[in-house]
Amino acid sequence: MTVVEIKNQIEKYKISKKKIFVTSSFQTQSIAMLHILSNIVEDINVMFLHTGFHFPETISFRDKVVELLGLHLVDVKSLVPKIQQKDGNGQFYFVSDPDYCCFLNKTQPLEPYLMQYDVWISGVRADQSATRKKMKVEQQGPFDIIRFHPMLDWSAKQIYEYRMLHQLPEHPLDKKGYQSIGCVPCTRKFDMSNERSARWFGMNKTECGLHTDLIK
């Protein structure tokens, strides 16, 4: 989608009085969409899934982007304290059961918001993984929410060019070889063959679970 097409689609949602929110991981690849939205929708809620395991650099970058773009940030956190997120052997779930860890810290905390809103905007791109390649620009999500993926057909090159054009900052870990940045325990440096392979390294896992329900 072009920027104009994104704007037109969001205007349709607004005319229909649909309640809209966006989720963002606040990586460099997130900033193009956030910049576009900040120029279209005033006071849109930007949900950040604050797991408590993020790199300090991610939190700093998030705060910088929020201030730069004038975003309304909502920290979404698990009801289960981090210290209690351990299995019967005392291991953190990110070690013994990463799927359950993602459920506790991402999927479950977001569910109440899915029931309150009509449209969920996400910056997933088809070139990020095989799972995301199967997604559509607009499709039905859980709790009858509309999933809108305006950046789905954008490439990493387009994101970069947009960022350069608008002089937008990059995540400080990019220069250190981290291109897909999530929680500290589950993030490794970039593998050119698969952008998402830097996440959950060695676990045969490239998605946290927020988007897998869209793939049939």
Language model features with spans:
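Nucleotide-activated chemistry modules centered on ATP-dependent adenylation/adenylyltransferase
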Residues: 1-216
